Design a protein with these regions (language model features):
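Substrate-binding pocket helix/loop in short-chain dehydrogenase/reductase
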Residues: 95-96, 100-108, 191, 199
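Active-site helix of classical SDR
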Residues: 119, 156, 164
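Alpha-helical segment proximal to the catalytic Tyr-Lys
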Residues: 124, 169-173, 227
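Active-site loop immediately N-terminal to the catalytic Tyr-X3-Lys motif
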Residues: 97, 145-151, 173-174, 206, ...
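C-terminal substrate-recognition "lid" of short-chain dehydrogenase/reductases
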Residues: 210-239
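Conserved glycine-rich cofactor-binding loop
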Residues: 11-12
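Residue(s) in the substrate-gating loop at a strand-loop-helix junction
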Residues: 140
Length: 241
């Protein structure tokens, strides 16, 4: 039986690329998404057309009860996850004096609270199974060095890094690794409205990253070859930081 991996925000961008790469490597991918059913269905279709295995699991990662119910039911009916990729995230940029409380809360709930909402229902079954496991979180260059106009986003991603390191220490003796991938400027919808020429000049490699390049690192961290790597934050940023 194929190992199963839950990928939150798996319908677009880095999440979609991760789902595609993992399915090509023989994992069964659980594609989480919230609103964009068309994109999720397209991703599922692309995986199946390539001979991979996947299914959809829609829920809001910011909704604690909904996440717990969906994940618990999925584990009880289909079995344990080998890995979880906590990828779903949003941004709502504004200079701090103009940042609304609603946008602060929305970004923290979706990005940081999702760490608890997504992983808390998964960890105890992993421990009880005594089979090890892999947890990968998606942080950001902004979580490492901050970024103007992204106080809320940077706070959420820095929080993910701290939580990742703490959980890694808890789970290491269980052979469950917990690592974070920190992308820089990746060519996804998240940077579509930004001044690309100006941003490109800031990157030592003079180009944006590809979602597949991030996905390749995630796939490695999920593999047996990465069994002795835990509590780490690995950047994919073309030398940006």
């Amino acid at each position: 039986m194929s190992k199963r991996v839950l990928v939150s925000g798996g319908s677009r961008g880095i999440g979609r690329a991760t789902a595609m790469v993992l399915s090509a490597q023989g994992y069964q991918v659980v594609i989480n998404y919230l609103r964009n059913h068309e994109a999720a269905t397209e991703t599922l279709g692309a995986i199946e057309a390539a001979g991979g295995s996947a299914y959809l699991l829609p829920f809001d990662v910011a909704d604690r009860e909904a996440a717990k119910a969906a994940i618990t039911h999925d584990i009880e009916t289909r079995g344990l996850y080998w890995g979880v990729v906590s990828n779903a995230g949003i941004a709502a940029d504004a200079a701090f004096p103009l940042l609304s409380g609603a946008d602060w809360d929305r970004v923290l709930h979706t990005n940081l609270d999702a760490f608890y909402n997504l992983l808390q229902p998964v960890v105890l079954p992993m421990i009880r199974a005594h089979q090890g496991g892999r947890i990968i979180t998606l942080s950001s260059a902004a979580g490492l060095v901050g970024n103007r106009g992204q106080t809320n986003y940077a706070a959420s991603k820095a929080g993910i890094i701290g939580a990742t390191k703490a959980l890694a220490q808890e789970l290491a003796k269980r052979q469950i690794t917990v690592n974070s991938v920190a992308p820089g400027l990746i060519d996804t919808d998240m940077i579509a409205a930004l001044p690309k020429d100006e941003l490109r000049r800031m990157i030592p490699m003079q180009r944006f990253g590809k979602p597949e390049e991030v996905a390749a690192l995630v796939a490695f961290l999920l593999s047996e070859a990465a069994a002795y790597i835990t509590g780490q934050v690995i950047s994919v940023n073309g030398g940006l930081v």
